[in-house]
Amino acid sequence: LFIDPFLLFNSTDSEYQKIHHEMIDYLLFLQKQSEKHPKLPSEMRKAWYSFSEVKQTWLGFSLSGNAGRGMGSDFAVGLHAGLNSIFKDFGSQTVTKGRHMEKICLISPRVGRDKISDFTANFAKKYLLEYTQSFAKQYLSADQCQEFSVAKAYFNWNTKTWASQKYYLPSFNSDYVLLTPKAMLTRDDTF
């Protein structure tokens, strides 16, 4: 299963649409950075272009367990270069209706549904944390949950950094678990 950005874009749920808008806004932010810095500095790559797999969703491909590879430095470099070249008009193009981050599949032959799902999960993370916390408080007992400080819970636009936040979540093997609504998920390769 994968988190499908098209399902977020086409959803009637305003929260899902908000996640898609945040992804587009972030890509536009990265595009501006790529114009200012044609060569990607390593500290910028680490701070803004590196996205690990949100393993607590237990989605995607992995030989064992839930720890996939995420989106490595090849993706970061390719995205940076793409936003300053083939996607220079990202957000202002007129060929398709709306802005679609799924076009980043074109930057590398290794970017497919698993990596797009990883990217999307990073932006859906705050929603998933709040969704799971609400479920945990309502339906789970205290011995099934604990408070976790979650790194990169959301992007703080004021400081231009990924921020941590504490959440009360289900616990499994000393880590938290994230629930993902079925309406966000697909098995199909739609992007």
PLM feature segments, named:
Residues 1-191:
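Nuclease-adjacent, charged terminal/linker segments that flank catalytic cores
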